[in-house]
Curated annotation (Swiss-Prot):
GO terms for molecular function: spermidine synthase activity. Belongs to the spermidine/spermine synthase family. It comes from Nitrosococcus oceani (strain ATCC 19707 / BCRC 17464 / JCM 30415 / NCIMB 11848 / C-107). Residues 6-242 form the PABS domain. Pathway: Amine and polyamine biosynthesis; spermidine biosynthesis; spermidine from putrescine: step 1/1. Keywords: Cytoplasm, Polyamine biosynthesis, Spermidine biosynthesis, Transferase. This is Polyamine aminopropyltransferase. Pfam families: Spermine_synt_N, Spermine_synth. It comes from the Bacteria. Homodimer or homotetramer.
C-alpha cells in the first residue's frame, strides 16, 4: 500500500501474507472524495492503474478478465435478461460488457462515489465508451437504499460489482441485502456478486454463500477466473437464484460481439468446482 522510492507500487494483503507490486512510471492523479482516497498511476507494463484506499481496483492490462466474467456468465444464464441493475461498477467496465447484449433494454448503475466514474471517463476512456448508450441510466448514491426502495420484480439481473466488504460496502454482503435483491428479481431473476479470492478469502466466500441462501436464494454457484492484480491472482464471482441451470449455450456460441477472455468453454470451465471448494460447500 505504498509507492516506494524505487518506483514500485506495492499492495500488501495481510490476511494472505503476500504482496503484489507494479513498476510505476508516474502518478497521474490523487484525490480524497467524501467516501475514499483515489489514486491513478501510469505503470510500466500494466497500463493505467486505479487504486482506492491503497487497494488496486483495476489495471488497463487485465481488467477484461473481471469485467467479462461479471457480465457474460450471468447474462447467458438468465433466459431473457432485459432489465439489469449494477450496484457499484463505477469504472463502467462491467456496464460496457452488459451493453454488448442486444437483448438488454435497460441498465441502471448505482455507484456511491461519482468521482470514480468521472476519473474512469478521463483516465480509462476505453471502459466508458458505452456510457452514452441510451439504455444506460446512472444513479450516484447508496446501493443499499436504492435496492431497498426499488419496486418488486423490477429487474431480471443484478450485478454487484462492489469493493471488498469493508466500510460502505460491508452491507452488500449481508442476508438482509440479498433478501431485498431477491424481492426485486422475483423467481426468475439472477444475482451475481464478486466474491474475492477462493484461496485467501475462503471463510468470507462460504459466509457470503450462506448469507445468499438466508436471503432467499436456494441455488448458489461460484465461478472462478484469473485476475493478476488482485490478491493471489485468482478471483471469483458467485451466482444466486432460484434456478441456475439455463445456460444459453447456443446464444453464447453465436455471440457477435468481441470478448478477450469469455467464451463458451471458459463459461463451462469457470464453474468447475475445485475439490477443496467442493469439500467446504458440502460441509457448510
Amino acid at each position: 500500500m505504498q509507492l516506494d522510492p524505487k518506483g514500485w507500487f506495492t499492495e500488501v494483503c495481510k490476511e494472505g501474507g503476500l504482496a503484489f507490486s507494479l513498476a510505476i512510471r508516474e502518478k497521474l492523479h490523487a484525490e480524497t472524495t467524501p467516501y475514499q482516497y483515489i489514486e491513478i498511476y501510469q505503470t510500466e507494463t500494466f497500463g493505467r492503474l486505479m487504486v482506492i484506499d491503497g487497494f488496486i481496483m483495476l489495471s488497463g492490462r487485465d481488467n477484461f478478465f473481471y469485467h467479462e466474467m461479471m457480465a457474460h456468465p450471468v447474462l447467458f444464464t438468465h433466459p431473457h435478461p432485459q432489465r439489469v441493475l449494477i450496484i457499484g461498477g463505477g469504472d463502467c467496465g462491467t456496464l460496457r460488457e452488459v451493453l454488448k447484449h442486444d437483448v438488454v433494454e435497460k441498465v441502471q448503475q448505482v455507484e456511491i462515489d461519482e468521482r470514480v466514474t468521472r476519473l474512469a471517463e478521463k483516465y480509462f476512456p476505453e471502459l466508458c465508451q458505452s456510457n452514452d448508450d441510451p439504455r444506460a441510466h446512472f444513479h450516484f448514491g447508496d446501493g443499499l437504499r436504492f435496492v431497498a426502495e426499488a419496486p418488486a420484480n423490477s429487474v431480471d439481473v443484478i450485478i454487484i460489482d462492489s469493493t471488498d466488504p469493508i466500510g460502505s460496502a460491508e452491507g452488500l454482503f449481508q442476508a438482509s441485502f440479498y433478501a431485498d435483491c431477491q424481492r426485486l428479481l422475483g423467481e426468475k431473476g439472477i444475482l451475481v456478486h464478486q466474491s474475492e479470492s477462493p484461496l485467501i478469502h475462503l471463510d468470507l466466500l462460504n459466509k457470503m454463500r450462506a448469507e445468499m441462501k438466508k436471503g432467499g436464494f436456494p441455488q448458489v454457484r461460484t465461478l472462478t477466473y484469473p485476475q493478476c492484480v488482485y490478491p493471489s491472482g485468482w478471483w471469483s464471482a458467485t451466482l444466486a437464484g432460484h434456478t441456475l441451470s439455463c445456460f444459453r449455450e447456443r446464444d453464447a456460441t453465436a455471440k457477435i460481439f468481441p470478448t478477450r477472455y469469455y467464451n463458451v468453454d471458459i463459461h463451462r470451465a469457470s464453474l468447475a468446482v475445485p475439490e477443496f471448494l467442493r469439500q467446504t460447500e458440502e460441509s457448510s
